[in-house]
């Protein structure tokens, strides 16, 4: 057992639209517990619909935390999320209650169980500098520069892997240490891996595909366009995570007249299906045998309520 780690947690992972949120609410009723967002996009304010955050009825049905608490103008790291979770779990009102972590971000679950390196926060000006250098000089030139400064890290990266090259350079400059050093420093588990009840929902692909299409059509009809309008008014950097939420680019193109309603919906649905496929692949390949896989939430609920 990890010293100080929560021993009564429930973890519910799965791709978008798989029925995780409804299952979490059922478990909150069953246990008297509270729900904790474990999805990197649902932390952002403004995009209630497009990130499929719990609606008013859901929020009234169970206690939810860490949803929509981050401004879309901010970048929000896994480390920041973990700090927020730690603060939440130490609140007196949360003691002796069951935390139910639900979401689709695999790295959040890994961090929760202590399997993610404690990555440093890099100053914004350092990040901006190296992203600017990448645009000007290209990945091969920066890979050569990384080879001079941090040859061991450079040896692990392909010369065309721009994102990881920039990350390695900014970490080296911002902290004075190689990214390899940080990657070898594992985090402290907040949830005990051995005692937690862990479920991953992996529905039938056809069922999930159809559900994604229906859900996005409802998003469109119920206010997704207004959400994107509100986001665009903020005049944010397109590179910010909130601006990359599925549907933002497509609805923006629709508002600008460069894409029809039908095409915007179709492209958003396709992008969501591709995202769900990537999530499913990650969960299949990265989660160990201690996670119980179910195709539907009813079977998962039955298992969770019979396994204490």
Swiss-Prot record:
Q: Write out the entry's keywords from A to Z.
A: ATP-binding, Magnesium, Nucleotide-binding, Transferase, tRNA processing
The residues that the entry says bind ATP are 14-21
Which positions in this protein are listed as binding substrate?
Answer: 16-21
Report the coiled-coil segments.
none
Cofactors named for this entry: Mg(2+)
Report the catalytic activity.
Answer: adenosine(37) in tRNA + dimethylallyl diphosphate = N(6)-dimethylallyladenosine(37) in tRNA + diphosphate
The cross-references to InterPro entries, in alphabetical order and at most eight, read: Dimethylallyltransferase (IPR039657), IPT (IPR018022), P-loop_NTPase (IPR027417)
Q: How does it assemble?
A: Monomer.
HAMAP family reported for this sequence:
IPP_trans
Q: Which family does it belong to?
A: Belongs to the IPP transferase family.
User: This protein is called what?
Assistant: tRNA dimethylallyltransferase
Q: What is the protein's species of origin?
A: Brucella anthropi (strain ATCC 49188 / DSM 6882 / CCUG 24695 / JCM 21032 / LMG 3331 / NBRC 15819 / NCTC 12168 / Alc 37) (Ochrobactrum anthropi)
Q: Per UniProt, what is the name of the gene that codes for the protein in this document? A: miaA
């Amino acid at each position: 057992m990890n010293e100080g780690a929560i021993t009564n947690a429930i973890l519910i992972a799965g791709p978008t639209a798989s029925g995780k949120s409804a299952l979490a609410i059922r478990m909150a009723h069953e246990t008297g517990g509270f729900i904790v967002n474990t999805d990197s996009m649902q932390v952002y304010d403004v995009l209630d619909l497009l990130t499929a955050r719990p609606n008013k009825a859901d929020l009234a049905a169970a206690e939810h935390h860490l949803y929509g608490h981050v401004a879309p103008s901010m970048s929000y790291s896994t480390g920041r999320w973990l700090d927020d979770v730690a603060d939440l779990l130490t609140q007196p009102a949360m003691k002796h209650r069951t935390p139910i972590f639900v979401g689709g971000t695999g790295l959040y679950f890994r961090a929760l169980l202590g399997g993610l390196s404690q990555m440093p926060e890099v100053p914004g000006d350092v990040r901006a500098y190296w992203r600017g250098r990448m645009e000007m000089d290209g990945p091969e030139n920066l890979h050569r520069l990384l080879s001079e400064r941090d040859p061991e890290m450079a040896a692990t990266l392909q010369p065309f892997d721009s994102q990881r090259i920039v990350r390695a350079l900014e970490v080296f400059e911002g902290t004075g240490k190689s990214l390899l050093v940080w990657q070898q420093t594992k985090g402290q588990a907040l949830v005990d891996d051995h005692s937690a009840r862990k479920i991953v929902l992996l529905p039938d692909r056809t069922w999930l595909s159809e559900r994604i299409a229906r859900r996005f059509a409802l998003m469109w009809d119920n206010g997704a366009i207004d959400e994107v309008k509100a986001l665009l008014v903020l005049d944010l950097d397109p590179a910010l995570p909130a601006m990359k939420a599925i549907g933002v680019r497509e609805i923006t193109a629709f508002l600008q007249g460069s894409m029809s309603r039908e095409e915007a919906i179709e492209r958003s649905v396709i992008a969501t299906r591709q995202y769900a496929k990537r999530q499913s692949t990650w969960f299949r390949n990265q989660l160990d045998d201690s996670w119980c896989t179910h195709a539907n939430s009813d079977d998962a609920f039955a298992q969770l309520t019979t396994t204490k």
